Structures are given as structure tokens and as C-alpha cells.
Amino acid sequence: PYITTNTLTRDCDTGIQNMGVYRTMVRNETSVVCNLTPGRQGYRNTLTWTNKDKVAPIAWAIAAPPAVHLATVAQLPYGVDEITLAGGMMGEAVNVVKCRTVDLLVPADAEIIIEGEIHPGETEMEGPFGEFAGFMGPVERRPVVRITAITHRRNPIYYGYTSQMPPSESTTIQSLTNAGIMLKMLRHDLGEIAVSDVFIDLTFAGMLGHAVIAMKPGYPGHSKKVGRLVAAMSPIKRVTVVDEDIDIRDHTHVEWAMNSRYNPSRDTVLIDDAYFPINMDPSVRS
């Protein structure tokens, strides 16, 4: 059995928390193995403890408010707490409470909270698991978590993300959340007001997926600049930039634009040696 919902960790140096989805294999009644993948924020947070020979705190919030689940899959800059994003979506702060046995804040309205500790050097093989990309995730050595507490409501509701051959629940919420974040970053943070819309396909979604950007270029090469920005800000594998008259959610319309306006030799930009911090894509593993 697996836990497939919100995982919370904390940076030992800054105190900033991270919330993400890291599949977690139930090992026995008192321990699990968490797929904290190198390069992702939960993994980095854990290292800030274990590299100092300290025990790292970790927790799972099962069946939290919907905005919390949406924020969990967001590809946010390192150091930004996803619970803050969830509060923005809700229009009010997320109620949080301190865990009983570890130093973490978790959503108070979650149905179930599982608390645990990661001790330096304790690892075990984890996997395989049917992942959001439609492939079996690989078996690799990952941290063992000693469970320290489980709290829950009376008659709690259990919830987990459904990952299967895409599109799935998992890829759909990744697409919605990360497209919105990408549009906000382009228009408001980077000043690219020529960008009018962003869509991320429902196959690999926010992780290694295909982003389609609609914009009105202001000068020659403007669309290539925006494409590079998108490639740099997230683990997106492909970026297609089209004019704003194209319905980017209509695959046929996008293909029409590609066939009628795209010149491969002139309009293709390849970025060599790009690193994607995820091992669910067979082309990355090969």
C-alpha cells in the first residue's frame, strides 16, 4: 500500500516548510519509505537535517481542504510555502496546528495527520509504483521514516491522488495549478504582459510536460525569449509559443497554427543538457 497525498518537510536552516507529493510505501505498522527524489524541495529540506547528523521531521496531511491539495502540486520557487498559496486560493489563511511529536505545522482541517522522523543513513528500496506519467516508477533506495504519531477525526475520510495512464486526476490538477502559476510569473513577476494565456497538457502536466503559451510578440525574437523563460522556471520539457488568436486548449487549433506558421529550421530552439529533477520519464532514465 501507498500514501499518495500531501507530504510536509521543513528546512533546518530557514525554518521554511515545503509541501509536495512524494509517493510513500508502507513498510510495516511503524515505518514507511518515502520517495524523496534528489533535486526536489522535500529532498533538499531533509538533507539540511541529515547532513548535520540530525533527525529530519516529516508529516502527511490526508484529506485536507481542496485548495491545499491544489497548492501541493504547484512548482513554486524554493523557499515559498505552499500553504501560503493555498490561503491565497481560499481568500483566507489556512488553519494550521503544530504536530504532536515533530516540529511542523500542518493543516488543522485535514482528516488524518501522520507524523514521522527520518534518521541519517536509514534507507531502503522503494517501488515500483504506477505513476502519473503512465509508467511504473523505478525501484530505488529512499529514506525510511519512523512513524511517531497518527491523529485523525472521528470516522476520518481517507484520500489519495489517483495516478494512472494520463489524463488522470493527478495530471489534471497539476496542469491547472502550474499553468496559473506560470501565467502569474510571466505577466506579473517578469513583466511579460504580452503573454495572454498558458496551458499545460494533461499527459505529464506540470512535470516534464508540454506548455503552450499564447502571446502577442512585441519584437522579433520575443516569443523565443518567453519560451526560454518558461523552460528555465519549471521542469517543462517542451514549450510551444503561438499567437494570441490561437485557442491553446484546442489541440487541433494548435496543430493548425504549427502547420501553417511554424518553420522548423527557423523557429526551433534546443536547450542542451537540461536537468529534470524527476525519474518518472523513461527518456530521462535512459
Please name every model-derived segment.
Residues 1-61:
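Internal mixed beta-strand/loop scaffold within catalytic domains of large alpha/beta enzymes
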